[in-house]
């Protein structure tokens, strides 16, 4: 068994169908911060330690942390960045003294933390604390339709926002949306179809694939630049993407030829692969796919730098992001890979799960499934430990958020 707890981060969506942030918890715990007995403070302590140890900006989008009120005096909270961080507080049955809770939450508010309050009207302190809530939180999995409406009515006069957790189906999400809920968490998006058209119907995706074929096939710079002249709209999109703040380049790039000179073929392939995942009118499932691809690529790169620093970073990234192309393009992955002259290491990892990149791809894929046994097995097979995976996941999440925050 992996000796340390594993981190889990789950998508949170807004009313515009966009990915707005993440809920962070331990894989072995609940997003409701309701572990049995007195174990929740220990779980909270482990979660706070993992997050506090990361130098990555994992809260560049809103980060939601479910915690017990019994953990609010933990010094580790003070070491976390307060900006865009919302503490989702479950009132402990052992914590029934309203004045002390009121003082504690007020201090956290003053320090810049957002406060979310689980819907616990039976708790003695609940009514005294409602006015401090920036977010009102409800467990949809344990609620009826009337409960959701009543919950919305109770908090509406306080001017807070509404977060629904554990939404399992599209029907439940629609009910929450109709009830005025602002943010949505749960597995409902995983079963929805993506909205993208296939590459055969999307000229920009077809042009991007053609450009990737040229670059990965070793075409010379003039040939690649000439191909781009045939697609002026795509050239504009590529250059706008390369000059976006998310990429952090030191010099402005004004032409594809300049991009090839400044970035090199491999680095340009990387950013073209990212651009493949641009989506118009993206829905919940599209955003999950975009984040999955970006996080897989960056996670493999982060883990590779720890485990196999001699392995080149860009091919690891491309392996991760290309592993999602079948869902993006709605075609069989072997068919797509056959059209891209990628290296044997990438090809073998994608198609037969062999070669030096395969173990890290297995870790990246397992980390999305929330199955503890599968993640532990993949992590062990790759020669990694839980701390390495946790920190790499936070770094990958921070990077992917910086990209999705600058989507077209």
Regions flagged by a language model, labelled:
Residues 26, 43-45, 83-86, 106-109, ...:
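Short, low-complexity, polar/charged sequence segments that are solvent-exposed and flexible
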Residues 35-39, 57-61, 107-111, 155-156, ...:
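N-terminal start-of-chain detector that recognizes signal peptides
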Residues 43-46, 146-152, 165-408:
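Conserved alpha-helical "signature site"
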